[in-house]
Amino acid sequence: MKKPSQLLAKSYDRKKYQQPPDYALYTQHNRDVAYSCKALAQVVGAVALANAGLDENLIAEFNRTLLANGWIQDLGKANSHFQAMVSGQSEIIQLLRHETISGLLVCLEPRFQEWLAPLGEKVKLIAVWGAIGHHRKFDDNTFPKKVMELKVYTSDDDFKANLKEMAQDLDLAEPPIFESDLTIAPNKDDICDFLAGESLDKIKAEFRKLESVFADEQSRRFVALVKALGIAADGAASGVAKKYKLAENYSLADFVTENLSKGLKPSDLTTLIYSWAWKSRDLKKEEIDLSKLPPGFVFRTFQENVKASESYLTFAQAGCGSGKSIAAYLWAHKWCDKLEKQGRNNLHIFFCLPTTGTTTEHFKDYALESGIPPELISLTHSRSSVDLETMAETAIQEEANEEENDIAKTASAALKAQQDKIEGLALWSTPLIVTTADTVLGLMANARRAIYSTPAIMQSVIVFDEIHAFDDYLFGHLLVFLKNFPRLPVLLMTASLPEQRRLAIEKVRPDLCYVPGDEKLETLPRYHIQYPVNHQNTWDAVEKCIANNGKVLWVRNRVEWANETYTEAKAKFPDISVNVYHSRLRYKDRSDRHRQVIDDFKQKGKAAILVATQVAEMSLDLSADLLITDIAPPPALIQRMGRLNRRATPDNPGEPKPALICSLPAENQVSPYSKEELKTAKTWVEKLKALNQPLNQKDLADKFAEVSDVKEYDYKEAEKRACFFGIPKNSGLWRTRPGSTREQGYTISVILKADYEAWKKQGLSGEPDADWIRKHEVAVPIRQEALKWEQVAGIRIAPNEAIAYNYNEQTREGVGARWL
């Protein structure tokens, strides 16, 4: 293509603008990224180093490295292939990505090497590693494409001006002046300055040699923080510049400082805690006084002990219904007060739970009605409406996999990337964040949204609740996160944890402060366990409970079993409330069902039956009079039993309630669990039965410890998977690719074709926004054919002939989605 009159960094709407707006210009974007890096270093740098346990004297080196990274990131956009791509040829295949070209220039071009030498080899190297990885697409498997040669426009006035400004900002000598452009070619016979493949092999070989310099964890933490904040800076620069269009209308320094200066005050958390305390009283609104606790209200000893912990890592293990959530906010209040006295007024709280269902209900129960201004709180898995609205983009292929040739899929990948960036940046100015654990621990896998959230994460205290529910990948990421951020305040909570995992946490963090539940509550007799029981026994127990206006919770291991039991219960008891609750409901329907179930169980003197799956283990704050459950692994059964007789207290103990544990319909129908897990469960149940007495939470935990696997957790394997920090010769450092946050699941989220068609009839342009997607997505079991369905906003659309959806919008009854 013909060399453009002005070099571009971003594409723009040529119908709207006769000339490129500032945000699209090569010189302006590079300047914006550098300024954003400088501001992030100023605001977040010191606390990030402290969180990682790094020497505070490294701050000057850190700031300089991050700034150099910002200037280097997009140097390589001054090339013919990239300029063609952002000038309308969006389907062009590039010989090398622009960030790879940036790395080649800095590492191999002699004039660049001499000019940048005063930075120091270490600063330059880390800055380059951050730059070539800022799109998470560089590692051992990065190779040139088999296409024509490209020109690097080193003689262009914009390129020269950019180098001159870079020199001034980094306090370097006058930059080299290139009288002609450089050529990068694919073939050995080509006349060129650099052979693409050979040059790429050369820098990768050099990087491999230098990995040994970063063998210690502290060095790898330094590198990872530079890379993450560099990516976040690029996101901020793209978002702010796109919104304000002209450089005179915005300041990256102001944006970063203002957004990251918003934080919670101790008084905000006092309001949240008092609000929750008053909600426990049956009072009229005018009787509530949020300036104080209700008369006679006293926090439990366990809650006070969690608050009193002085360690950076606290582990609260207490039975279901012990008040762990409020203990967490008391703990956060203590840290908020402590950090405010140290001059930090921008504290964030991340309250992390395992699933979207648990986050939604926690958000409703604690944050939404807390009295804290709504602009200071966020439910991240459903939030998408933020001030930036859109990001300045290059072209859709920039975010797609290198091997992806499908235009629709590349467009969808670009939209998903934009959504992740916007949602990540939104958290900078949102101090109270209720979210899934992936939002934070995704950082360990280089997950895009987590990386863009890094500045907020570094300014936070973090609660990880229900950690027993983390799969092996997520728990491994938790361990790596805890080990590498030893001075970031973290609270872990659960009712039970396998001994293997507890020991693994203690090994990576010997400073762990363990807080057990209140002894009186933990030893309060709550359950009568029965195992095994037959079909008739269960229905007899249900009839007896219903006759006394009791509440029945029946938990099945599979959705189809739950639907069968629900149908049978509805037929047997047509005059009482019978509901089914599982993940096959659209998110908006599931949220309605959740609230309906909670309300039904709160009504005194009125019978109710809830049939549920594993969703009952964490997201339901209800108290049943009868529990019926399929045999399941001990942690799952402990959680299910936590919903039985939940309101019992030492002052008002009541009688222990029956828990009926049923054998599986067939011995081979163990899924979603393993035979080994269920064998352990049977041993655990027999040990409990052998006590020959009403059971308490401590009994459940003690006997679980006796049957837990004490084999040491494989931390080295977790470290390999946590590619954010990485280990030499495997991942991290100069390699930057996204990994997996969780193990592969059994379900996939889809949008129903009927819902998508209804959205299109509204005549809206583009694709549905994230809020609409979240409300309408539904999980279905994975089948190979689903992977071939068309997509919208990164979510597959389920054809009407493949998935049936049973739900009545008026009565709000139905069993949800199923394969046809």
Where do the model's predicted regions map?
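Interdomain hinge/linker at the junction between the two RecA-like core domains of SF2 helicases
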Residues: P498-N548
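Walker A/P-loop
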Residues: E310-A332
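Accessory nucleic-acid engagement/destabilization modules that flank
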Residues: K2-L272
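Conserved RecA-like helicase motor core of SF1/SF2 enzymes
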Residues: I93-R97, S583-Y587, S591, K606-E655, ...
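Post-DEXD/H (motif II) to motif III coupling segment of the RecA-like Helicase ATP-binding lobe
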Residues: I451-F464, H468-E519
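C-terminal accessory region of SF2 helicases/translocases
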Residues: K2, L8-A9, A624, I638-M641, ...
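Conserved Walker A/P-loop ATP-binding site and its immediately adjacent core
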Residues: N346-S370, L379-S385, L497-R501
